[in-house]
Amino acid sequence: MIRHRPFGSGHPYAVDTEQRSPVDPVAGEPLVLGVRTSAEVESVVLEWERDGVAEAPVALERVPRSSRGQVVDGGHLASAQARLARASGGWRVTLDDLVADERIRYRFTGDGGGRAQSTRWFETTVARWTASGVGPAVDGVDRVVAGSVHRLVRGDETLRVRFALPLAPGERVVGFGERFDTLDHRGLALDSAVFEQYKSQGAHRRTYLPMPFAHVVGGVGWGFHVRTSRRVWFDVGASTPDALVVEAETGPDGELALGLYDGDPRTVLRRFLDEVGRPEELPDWVFRLWASGNEWNTQAEVMRQAELHREHDVPLGSIVIEAWSDESTFTTWRDARAKVADGAEPRRLADFEFPEHGAWPDPKGMVDELHRRDVRLVLWQIPLIKMRPHPAGQVKADADAAIRDGVLIREEAPDGTLRPYRNRGWWFPLGLMPDLTDERAAHWWTEKRRYLVEEIGVDGFKTDGGEHAWGRELVYLDGRRGDEKNNVFPVHYAKAFGDLMRRSGKAPVTFSRAGFTGSQAHGTFWAGDENSTWEAFRWSLYAGLNAASSGIVYWGWDLAGFSGDVPTAELYLRSAAAAAFVPIMQYHSEFNHHRTPSRDRTPWNIAERSGDERVLPVFRRFAQLRERLVPYLAEEARRAVTAGEPLMRPLFFDAPHAHEAFAHPFQWMLGDALLVAPVVEEGAGSVRAWLPDGEWVDAFRGTRHTGGVVERDVPIDEAAVWIRADAVDRFAGVFV
């Protein structure tokens, strides 16, 4: 076997062994060509031509087997990612001195085992960067730096546009969607690619939910939106301190639109949301405590956990069940029995028999009982048809119907024909992917789940995944390619399930981790997979503040992390104190193969594991406080949605010129009346907080303060929260 894939897998941050890099060769830059071979191949030679003239064959060098991707924490998600990340070795060659516009034709021949094997011939043309007098189409006051526009062209096609925007001394740049590493991005470089980075997003500086939008604050006040769904790179003063350099992929015509907005952060965000879609007000119950654990995978366990919340007097608003399904169709409850049906047909509750001793003997009865307890139920989803191991039964019928009915994203086969795209990511590899950007396909997909809402009574869906569309060459049902549509897939994924909820007469509650520009209008979000560490705690708060700056209203994170061993009692309680004052308060834990001791993030398990008797009463105190805050949160969310403002608001929204707003990056306003300053360092017993101008009242102690820096000791059972003095009456009976 000898294989070369010019585009590779489409992984945005890695070069595959068998790909061409860069995919589009550029004059003056080295071009690396790689192949992967079977073990018997002993040598590989590149045959190639330049503008039809044969060049001397070049021998490839062997690439050693990589050790990257080794499993370090034993989790099933880590194992899956590691299997994909490990490279099996291959061959590569580097070509230099490429000339603009020359056509390169090449193939590879490998020898070994007594025979030669060759790939087919591949062709590409060398692109070049050239200065251009035509920049992006600007809507607003034109800030594009004169002479900064360049285009990457190949023949008559434009591949990318690069230009610069000015940065004045003292200006800060905030936003870009959900970003984990910092609040002010000046001095850094980043890009806008939807990507599933399993844990440590802040260290890798990658995100599930990017947006090519940001605020520039601290000067005259402005913001920008690169109006594209294609990938964009931002050099935010990293290379040139006084310039924000933007490089964007384009279509062949080279057109690119740029929105520039003058004004304070509220004005900038409002204008951005007017373009891309305002958030929709969701029911009050989303502000109550969300609880889940991946090992809550039976009806008995779900009800046991619900009962434990009641027994320990911890208010519970909703339960998220991840491992509820057969793990193949994601429409059928595990252990349920049903005849194999046409995969296009919506299921009905009457289709299923639920064995008395199965995992879910009466899912409808379970949901009814939860509703009687005023607890909502959210079910997990993934936008894939599982194809490994080889499908059988209902999942095979589903796959056959999806192919027959033409509802899948496709890719080009080597012979140029189109075939169903097979997931190239590490999670559910080779799965089929419905084109949820297409209304017909989205309806086809979600109707199969309608019985869960209308007959079982489910209140929402955890729309997990959404990052599985890899490759610019993918073909969507409207004919557009992956370079243009992969990023917006998760937006349509959440919309599709929100539309299902609406059709069924319920609020469009979805709980997503992936998204892009336009996600603001679709449901709630959490910050994805993270470890139980103090560093991850801080990364998650940065993520929430950047997401809020980009217009996400309903956001939370797995408080104290979900992966690895349980958090310390201190981390758990400090995280709970912070989570009580963000839009979504929820805890969750990763699958641990049901090993003991349990890694559940319930307060009673953390209390047992840590041996710290403070855990349960302190968590209870914050959960009960959260319950009393729900009316305030609902009212402030309504105002935020109407006004186009964040609910969890970084301080620069109120004081864009104040240095202190960035000197205290982990503070925020929750609505108009509460200022929150969490403890985010291990062993810290106090915080140094900054209060904007005005009168403030300590929420827990009643002491009054004027604006400025305040030092406050923070016992483990308190949070550093201040109320605007003119709003104290709104919190009568809340902080008790």
Where are the regions that the model predicts?
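Glycan-association/targeting regions that enable binding to alpha-glucans and other polysaccharides
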Residues: 1-167
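Beta-sheet entry/capping signal
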Residues: 43, 108, 173, 212-213, ...
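Catalytic and substrate-binding clefts that recognize carbohydrates or anionic sugar/phosphate headgroups
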Residues: 110-286, 293-295, 299, 306-311, ...
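Flexible loop/turn segments at secondary-structure boundaries
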Residues: 222, 231-234, 295-299, 325-331, ...
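Generic beta-strand/beta-sheet core signal
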Residues: 227, 292, 317-324, 355, ...
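Aromatic-lined carbohydrate-binding/catalytic grooves of carbohydrate-active enzymes
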Residues: 280-460, 465-478
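Gly/Pro-rich turn-and-neighbor structural signature
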Residues: 292, 298-304, 308-311, 364, ...
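Catalytic core of carbohydrate-active enzymes
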Residues: 498-500, 507-509, 515-526, 539-540, ...
